[in-house]
A protein has these predicted regions:
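Acidic, glycine-rich active-site loops and adjacent beta-strand->loop/helix elements
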Residues: 24-28, 53-57, 81
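Short, acidic/polar
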Residues: 2-8, 57-68
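A glycine-rich helix N-cap at a beta->alpha junction
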Residues: 40-55
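Histidine/acidic residue-rich metal-binding segments in metalloenzymes
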Residues: 61-228
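Short catalytic-loop micro-motif centered on adjacent basic/acidic residues
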Residues: 20-21, 50-53, 156-161
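Short secondary-structure boundary/capping elements
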Residues: 2-3, 30-34, 58, 134-142
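Metal-associated gating/positioning segment near the N- to mid-region
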Residues: 1-44
Length: 228
């Protein structure tokens, strides 16, 4: 199994010099005790590193105390369900996270309510249904909501792994305290080809989408719309 030691070695071999480690681990990084354990374990890493502090529906008061926390690169918010159990999907709880945040909030932006409604579209054994279930509306609906909350509370939000042309257009028009990321896997593959070639190895959240989204992501990169 990958750990901080082996993962950082792989990063260096791949030409990556710095990593921000996510909090959806076992145990999750959602309190100061677990965060300090990560700092100690980080001494075995080969590359530059920092750690996200995971937001939950219950730990929002801790988020006020992160401003000067050494080694903390930000707060991670899972607005849609993914790996781990750090889901914060109720709008009131999302608002509490932003209200108490003392660092940038990096968001896995998918609308959990829409995900639940569309779950019936999953066909067991057919990975091509993954982007149908987690469709474009799942992403853009959540991203609009996150931006609205962040702007109203004058907080910084960083939308992670953007996958849709709708999000690119929307986020490009709402910069300032709002930044966004496009990841290599969404710039090197598109559906349905990736699922034909790689099967479930191409399955991720949010999913790899069709070529029209792939092309808009590249358009954003070439025109410096995305921030990371």
């Amino acid at each position: 199994a990958e750990d901080l030691h082996s993962g950082s070695r792989a990063a260096i071999v791949g030409g990556i010099t710095s990593v921000f480690e996510m909090p959806n681990t076992n145990p999750p990084t959602t309190n100061f005790e677990e965060f300090q354990k990560k700092i100690s374990l980080g001494k075995r890493m080969y590359c530059n590193h920092a750690f996200y502090f995971g937001a939950t529906a219950e730990n929002y008061q801790l988020l006020e105390k992160l401003k000067d926390l050494n080694g903390c690169c930000g707060i991670k918010l899972f607005a849609g369900s993914s790996t781990g159990n750090l889901l914060v999907d109720k709008e009131d709880d999302i608002e509490k996270v932003f209200k108490h945040a003392s660092k940038v909030v990096a968001v896995h932006s998918e609308d959990e309510e829409i995900l639940k409604l569309r779950k019936k579209l999953i066909e067991k054994g057919n990975v091509k249904t993954h982007p149908i279930w987690r469709n474009e509306e799942v992403a853009i609906s959540s991203t609009r909501k996150i931006v609205k909350i962040a702007k109203r509370l004058n907080k910084k939000a960083h939308i992670l792994h953007v996958t849709t042309k709708e999000e690119v257009d929307f986020l490009s028009q709402n910069k300032g305290n709002i930044t966004f990321e496009i990841t290599p896997q969404h710039l090197t593959m598109y559906a349905p080809d990736c699922y034909d070639k790689l099967g479930s190895y191409a399955q991720m959240n949010p999913p790899i989408r069709d070529k029209s989204h792939y092309e808009r992501l590249w358009y954003a990169v070439r025109n410096n719309y995305n921030d990371t």
